[in-house]
């Protein structure tokens, strides 16, 4: 049976419709990349994969549709493209370099991705944090299925409307700072907080996205610190410990990124790189 949905927005198309009435995309027209899953792919027997929403150093996020519950979802695929050691076969299967898996700790990163996704799925619905619906292995990699949050990113809101005053900013950000504190209580750190990972809903409330970058504080060390097995750094928002393999990561990592995000909200200026700030900073 043909599934007639727009691969950009997942709106249902009636028989005979040639354009999506929601976003205007011609039916059958897709935008994709050679390294991404082919739009129209079915995962875990029930998740329809649409176009890419974004990509990072270790994962790709797609818009998706739960064919059983009939609702939009966001699907995060573990695909550490920044290593240069993964490829796609037949538009689905991920092909790993055996040398990478054995020598560079990529297998450990894969296991950690799964472990943390499962832990986040058990957190329950923390207001202000995107919910995790499902975690599974397929195509030689791992997937996290999350709630799809309608709205625009905080980054787009700021680019469209300009900086906000401090009072407005703190009023908006306080709920997700409180949500982040709850996540930290469960021993999880986000590691990728920035304006493009915060969604502004139609009611003005913020939701923290992309928990696929999160890391368990209990993986290493008796001191509660974790050593980064995969480098994840975002210019202007990541603290210095995320720029090297030996960096000690903790709740302070998210605090730095949140403070940098608030700075950007109030000024519209990208904070200097943490590595640059260490030179002559007092």
Language-model features, listed with the residues they occupy:
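AlphaC helix of the eukaryotic protein kinase fold
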Residues: 86-122
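Activation-segment/catalytic-loop signature of the eukaryotic protein kinase fold
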Residues: 134-135
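Conserved short submotifs of the Hanks-type protein kinase catalytic core
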Residues: 139-153, 157
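Activation segment signature within eukaryotic-like protein kinase domains
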Residues: 172-173
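Protein kinase catalytic-loop region centered on the HRD/HxD motif
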Residues: 176-188
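Conserved activation segment of eukaryotic-like protein kinases, specifically the C-terminal portion
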Residues: 225-241
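Conserved end of the kinase activation segment
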Residues: 241-251
């Amino acid at each position: 049976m043909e599934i007639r949905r727009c691969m950009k927005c997942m709106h249902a198309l009636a028989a005979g419709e040639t354009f999506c009435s929601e976003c205007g995309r011609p039916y059958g027209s897709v935008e994709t990349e050679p390294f991404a899953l082919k739009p129209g792919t079915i995962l875990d027997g029930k998740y329809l994969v649409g176009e890419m929403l974004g990509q990072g150093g270790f994962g790709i996020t797609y818009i998706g549709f739960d064919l059983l519950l009939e609702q939009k979802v966001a699907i995060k695929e573990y695909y550490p493209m920044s290593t240069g050691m993964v490829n796609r076969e037949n538009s689905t299967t991920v092909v790993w370099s055996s040398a990478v898996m054995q020598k560079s700790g990529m297998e450990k990163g894969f296991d950690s991705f799964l472990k943390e996704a499962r832990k986040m799925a058990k957190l329950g619905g923390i207001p202000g944090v995107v919910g995790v619906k499902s975690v599974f292995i397929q195509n030689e990699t791992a997937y996290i299925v999350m709630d799809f949050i309608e709205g625009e990113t905080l980054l787009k809101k700021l680019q469209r409307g300009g900086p906000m005053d401090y009072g407005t900013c703190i009023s908006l950000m306080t709920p997700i700072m409180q949500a982040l504190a709850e996540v930290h209580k469960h021993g999880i750190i986000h590691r990728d907080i920035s304006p493009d990972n915060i969604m502004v809903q139609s009611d003005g409330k913020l939701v923290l996205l992309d928990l696929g970058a999160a890391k368990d504080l209990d993986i290493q060390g008796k001191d509660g610190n974790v050593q980064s097995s995969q480098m994840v750094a975002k210019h202007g928002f990541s603290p210095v410990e995320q720029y090297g393999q030996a960096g000690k990561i903790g709740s302070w990592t998210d605090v730095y990124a949140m403070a940098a995000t608030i700075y950007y909200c109030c000024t519209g200026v990208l904070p200097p790189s943490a590595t640059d700030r260490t030179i002559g900073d007092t």
